[in-house]
Swiss-Prot record:
Topological region Extracellular: 103-553
Membrane topology: Multi-pass membrane protein
Compartment(s) where it occurs, according to its Swiss-Prot or TrEMBL record: Apical cell membrane; Cell projection, Cilium; Cytoplasmic granule; Cytoplasm
Protein name: Epithelial sodium channel subunit alpha
Keywords attached to this entry: Cell membrane, Cell projection, Cilium, Cytoplasm, Cytoplasmic vesicle, Disulfide bond, Flagellum, Ion channel, Ion transport, Membrane, Sodium, Sodium channel, Sodium transport, Transmembrane, Transmembrane helix, Transport
Organism: Pelodiscus sinensis (Chinese softshell turtle)
Gene name tied to this protein: SCNN1A
Cysteines engaged in disulfide bonds, as pairs: 130-297, 222-229, 274-281, 385-470, 407-447, 407-466, 411-462, 420-447, 420-470, 422-436
Pfam families, per the entry: ASC
Length: 642
């Protein structure tokens, strides 16, 4: 059955068509505005690219790094793309190799050495002069009597030498008996013995090869249980006797309640004359201290409130001293050197006479010229120096400013107290400690000499812990010698000195010595350090390398950093999306037998049932062909089909 539908075309008027076009344009504009508004509403604070390809495509199209744009522009030519890719990454690697060299140089903290010559008034250094005799022998003879007898007997046994050439047999026998009693109590643990060994010995360090036949004398040191002993040996018998005598002399001093009363601190009895810059010195210009071996010591120009200054060089513009060097009352077995000992050092620094001093000969005028030299080091990462010693893990036992020697000696004394239970007499006493005395500390000598071996080989770590100061001032000394006074003038010179000091100089030339200390020149040298590779230099070198290889700026570095951050962010986002997709459950599927239920079976078709269907036709009016004509836009009209 067919039904024919007749459609009647109706022509749309022109005005209606224009209105319709205008309405469609307005609707299109509204749709675009709504879409733009929705896009702005959905725009976030931080937007990332959707893929790696999009990220690198955007970077290569917009970066200011030279060569990166070629990776995109040459993508249709695979050979060029490969060439520029290899060249780009090779250049990148070379640039960062240069960066590594620059960073390594920067973190090595190199320095430049600066040498300056300064011309100014020079502050005169402190000068310490010692008598080389710790005590007057007449004042300590009673305390040293037992030690002297033991030493005399030892010299007789070893070298057949008697200190007293005229001695009765009874006195000798009595002395020998007393010595034997003393040896059994004190010295038998540390006896002097002659030893001769023919086998060679190898010494550690830089010591020259020594045959053991040269090691002739020494003394034994044992621990408290006498289970461990060793020989403290010397190649010279004089050195061995003096060291052994000094060891027991220290024990005697430690037992004495007060040794200050024995000090001969009379300035005039040692210093006959003192002048600085042609002006006489007075008591306000020196300080006094006592050394157990070097005796009474006088330090000139150590008062910080009134320091001497020198404007001109020369012998007449320095310090001139006339000192007494007679040995009428010296300890014979301890004071083996005649003269005086002098040392030049900075103010507020202890005078370590055995390290930096030298001896002045009697009957000689010693002229010492000085040249000042200051070294200033950079601290922090540039060198292992310290400003004031506050960052050094060693307690300063001296009442002075920090020096390397102060730290080293304090370190040894602290280890001495910890290891041996007592302090060494030559160094300051730590709080709560007492000086070593073998009546209380039987094996302190064994402990001390064992500790000395560890100290010198840096097993204690004192040389590693004690760092050098960042500013050090040293004086380069040059000495000249001449006989004083001359043979034709010595009579009247010594006569005047005897009348002036009320002391009869009997030995004349061997009784006095003259010392002149002055600046050789009024210029002094300063050695300084400055950083050779600063942060500014590093940034400049990095910029030069970046410009050389890529011709870019700091903003290009920011672009590269942005690329790295975007790459990391995209990696995290994609990984998170992949993880979420694995967590979403799959859609449910009906069971395989769901349609087996008889209730869901379709009805069988009845062949006798008639076929019925309904056809609905929707008849609309066909548009006019004039409606296909485009609307006017921008003042133009396009004519369509009629």
């Amino acid at each position: 059955m067919h039904q024919v539908v007749t459609v009647k075309a109706e022509k749309v008027p022109m005005g209606k068509r224009l209105r319709r076009c205008k309405q469609e344009a307005e609707n299109q504009q509204k749709v675009e505005e709504v879409a733009e508004k929705l896009e702005k509403e959905h725009e976030g604070l931080i937007e990332f690219h959707k893929s790696y390809h999009e990220l690198f495509q955007f970077f290569c199209n917009n970066t200011t790094i030279h060569g990166a744009i070629r990776l995109v522009c040459s993508k249709r030519n695979k050979m060029k793309t490969a060439f520029w890719s290899v060249l780009f990454f090779l250049t990148f690697g070379l640039m960062y190799w240069q960066f590594g060299i620059l960073y390594r140089e920067y973190f090595s903290f190199p320095v430049n050495l600066n040498l300056n010559l300064n011309s100014d008034k020079l502050t005169f250094p402190a000068v310490t002069l010692c008598t080389l005799n710790p005590y007057r022998y007449s004042a300590v003879r009673k305390e040293l009597d037992e030690l002297d007898r033991i030493t005399h007997q030892t010299l007789m046994d070893l070298y057949n030498y008697s200190m007293s050439q005229v001695q009765s047999n009874g006195a000798a026998q009595s002395s020998q008996k007393r010595s034997q009693r003393s040896l059994s109590h004190h010295v038998q643990r540390h006896p002097l013995r002659r030893r001769k060994r023919n086998e060679p010995v190898s010494l550690k360090g830089n010591s020259p090869p020594v045959d053991k036949s040269d090691w002739k004398i020494g003394f034994i040191l044992c621990n408290e249980t006498n289970e461990d002993c060793f020989h403290q040996t010397y190649s010279s018998g004089v050195d061995a006797v003096r060291e052994w005598y000094s060891f027991h002399y220290i024990n005697i001093l430690a037992r004495m309640p007060d040794t200050k009363a024995l000090d001969e601190s009379n300035f005039e009895s040692f210093i006959y004359a003192c002048r600085f810059n042609e002006v006489t010195c007075d008591k306000a210009n020196y300080t006094h201290f006592h050394h157990p071996l070097y005796g009474n010591c006088y330090t000139f120009n150590d008062r910080n409130n009134s320091l001497w200054t020198s404007s001109l060089p020369g012998i007449n513009n320095g310090l001139s001293l006339l000192v007494r060097t007679e040995q009428n009352d010296y300890i014979p077995l301890l004071s083996t050197v005649t003269g005086a000992r002098v040392m030049v050092h900075e103010q507020n620094e202890p005078a370590f006479m055995d390290d930096g001093g030298f001896n002045v000969r009697p009957g000689i005028e010693t002229s010492i010229s000085m040249r000042k030299e200051t070294t200033m080091l950079l601290g922090g990462s540039y060198s292992d120096c310290t400003e004031d010693g506050s960052d050094v893990p060693v307690q300063n036992l001296y009442s002075s400013r920090y020096t390397e020697q102060v730290c080293i000696r304090s370190c040894f004394q602290i280890h001495m107290v910890k290891r041996c239970g007592c302090a060494y007499y030559f160094y300051p006493l730590p709080p709560g400690a007492e000086y070593c005395d073998y009546t209380k500390h039987i094996a302190w000598g064994y402990c001390y000499y064992k500790l000395q071996v560890e100290f010198k080989s840096n097993i204690l770590g004192c040389f590693s812990k004690c760092r050098k100061p960042c500013e050090v001032t040293k004086y380069q000394l040059s000495a000249g010698y001449s006989h004083w006074p001359s043979a034709v003038s010595e009579n009247w010179v010594f006569h005047i000195l005897s009348q002036q000091n009320k002391y009869n100089i009997t030995s004349k030339r061997n009784g006095v010595a003259k010392v002149n200390i002055f600046f050789e020149e009024w210029k002094y040298k300063t050695n300084g350090e400055s950083p050779a590779f600063t942060v500014v230099t590093l940034l400049s070198q990095l910029g030069n390398q970046w410009s050389l290889w890529f011709g870019s700026s700091v903003l290009s570095v920011v672009e590269l950093a942005e690329l790295i951050l975007d790459f990391i962010a995209i990696t995290i986002i994609l990984s998170f999306k992949r993880f979420r997709s694995r967590q979403v459950p799959a859609p449910s599927v009906p069971p395989p037998g769901a349609h087996d239920n008889t209730a869901f079976q379709s009805e069988p078709a009845d062949p006798s049932a008639p076929h019925r269907f309904t056809v609905e036709a929707v008849v609309t009016t066909l548009p006019s062909y004039n409606s296909l004509e485009p609307c006017r836009r921008d003042g133009e009209a396009v004519i369509g089909l009629e």
